[in-house]
Amino acid sequence: MATAVAGPEIERLIQLLARLPGLGPRSARRAALHLIKKRDALMTPLASALQVAIDKIEVCKSCGNIDTRNPCTVCTDPRRDPSIIVVVADVADLWALERASATNGRYHVLGATLSPLDGVGPDDLTIDALVARAHDPAVSEIILALNATVDGQTTAHYVTDLLQEAGVKVTRLAHGVPVGGELDYLDEGTLSAAMRQRTLF
């Protein structure tokens, strides 16, 4: 029977850190020890940054990005091309495309992809808002930058069908994105090439 080596507050910190993507119990324990050892240099500023995030970060009412501004920095950037809307499943995908400087269009975050097995249906996504945006006369192209997974492609087909009446060109990323691949894990060169080689969907 294992005995406790730390108080409940430290155990709680470890449990919370273990919930983060990529951190298991062992990594969370190491991270907690590091934070505690670097209390002034790291833990206190991190706690402050987390509190600011809680207080100030919100979801952009226009595109679904997260930012401290609403509408977000991307939506209010006058250098952006308002005729192009790049559709992504998640904010992480938007950030991946931005790191690659792959487009100067605006974005629309669906919030997920259709996944019947996970109970994610059309009503769980922001598809209605996308269709409404597509009817704006200033919009001429919708780029589907969705993961090359079964769920991503199912979502792309579903969205394409709904966008037919809007009369906009619907394109998707080129097949340089590997099947089964997720945008957030691709390098910038691959993302840039895929954006340049997009095709009609």
Curated annotation (Swiss-Prot):
CDD domains per record: TOPRIM_recR
Gene3D superfamilies: 3.40.1360.10, 6.10.250.240, RecR Domain 1 (1.10.8.420)
GO BP term, pick one: DNA repair
Database matches in InterPro entries: DNA_Rcmb_RecR (IPR000093), Rcmb_RecR (IPR023627), Rcmb_RecR_Znf (IPR015967), TOPRIM_dom (IPR006171), TOPRIM_RecR (IPR034137)
Entry keyword Lyase: no
Entry-linked SMART domains: TOPRIM (SM00493)
Keywords on record: DNA damage, DNA recombination, DNA repair, Metal-binding, Zinc, Zinc-finger
A Pfam family this chain is assigned to: Toprim_4
A single MF term (Gene Ontology): zinc ion binding
Residue span, Toprim domain: 83-178
Zn finger limits (C4-type): 60-75
Task performed by this protein: May play a role in DNA repair. It seems to be involved in an RecBC-independent recombinational process of DNA repair. It may act with RecF and RecO.
NCBIfam families assigned to the protein according to its UniProt record, in alphabetical order: recR
Family classification: Belongs to the RecR family.
Name assigned to this protein: Recombination protein RecR
